[in-house]
Regions:
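Surface-exposed amphipathic alpha-helical tracts and adjacent flexible/coil segments at the periphery
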Residues: 1-171
Length: 171
């Protein structure tokens, strides 16, 4: 199978599906890289862990100071490189219809509470979407019945976005 890049639109995903018959895996939840995905060198230069080799230390999620050319601090201790987190949970049905066969949720450097909450949320969304699509079924037989109401907004987030799912906007 192929893991698709996070910045693809739904139309681009459909075009890829039409052009090839391999299983397609799509990121649906997690950090959106501030750099060009797959071409980040910040992690490697700051921590010896390469994001291009699946070991990103996420230095873009840290706080930084913004200093002007005179050396004056303009902004202190802010998340200057952190863009919002990807959340496509409302679009699961569209992704299934577009031919996605597997969903990827980022869990690197996340605590167990975050993982439990987000995975449970997506499990419910996927099950609901599959139930309304005759001919589709789960690829696993296990059941998940959390004793809480999963809600990703209750876990740490820098704000949510569907990124380029509906296409890129000019400007």
């Amino acid at each position: 199978g192929v893991i698709l890049e996070r910045a693809l639109s739904l139309d681009e995903i459909r075009a890829i599906r039409a052009a090839c018959g391999v299983d397609l895996e799509c990121f649906v939840h997690g950090a959106i890289c501030v750099g060009y995905s797959g071409r980040c060198f910040l992690s490697r230069s700051m921590s010896e862990r390469s994001g291009n080799r699946g070991a990103c230390s996420q230095p873009c999620r840290l706080t930084y100071d913004l200093v002007d050319e005179s050396g004056r601090t303009v902004v202190k201790g802010r998340h200057l490189l952190s863009v919002r987190d990807l959340n496509l949970s409302d679009r699961i049905g569209e992704l299934i219809d577009a031919g996605i066969t597997s969903f990827k949720i980022e869990g690197r450097l996340k605590d167990v509470g975050y993982i439990k909450n987000v995975v449970s949320h997506y499990r419910q969304r996927i099950d609901r979407a599959l139930a309304s699509r005759p001919g589709f079924c789960r690829s696993s037989v296990g059941e998940s019945r959390p004793d809480f109401q999963p809600d990703p907004s209750k876990s740490f987030t820098r704000g949510e976005s569907e990124y380029f799912f509906d296409g890129r906007r000019a400007g």
